[in-house]
Amino acid sequence: HPSERMRALVPIAGVIKRATKPEQVQAIIDRYAACPGWNGGHYYGNEIDGGVFDRMVADRIERLTNYGIGTHLADTVSDPAERERIIRGRAETWAREFDANSLYILYRAGIGSDMTPLAGNIKAPLLNVLADTDSVVDVALGQPTVDLLKSKGVDAEFHEIKTRYGHAGPMIDADLWADKLRAFLDRIP
């Protein structure tokens, strides 16, 4: 079983139970259905002219900006036009490589997704890391999740990092929890 072969688990910005609703899935579908070339999701070969590519780029720019990347760039790149160019470049790269149908399919998979009943199957020690400014995964879920895992016999720890960078904070500010990660990994054979 894969969980018996893992040395450690370090989820960042994750949850054990998703609260996705069918309306969220439909909102994504509706957003893309407004593109003239969507064709019920059969947009392939018509991404640019059909508006799907531009919609994906716009959605990704919004996501990157709201996930803390925009704040990080504002702190590290003085020129607003350059910040916009960087975000747009990342969004365009993503839009070329990602399938728009996957956006709602991933959300749909989250409906009723609850790993709580399987939590006791986790054999590897787990360090759950969340950012105090995350607008996607509420940091208040961190300790209760770890408490639940511990009640199922999982060797689990929670670590909250203080960062300005929201959902992307654990990656951007990895140095803030590097010592915690090192200590966690050092105690595991």
Language model: regions and residue ranges:
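An acidic- and aromatic-residue-enriched active-site/binding cleft used to recognize and process polar
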Residues: H1, P11-I16, A131-T133, I161-R164
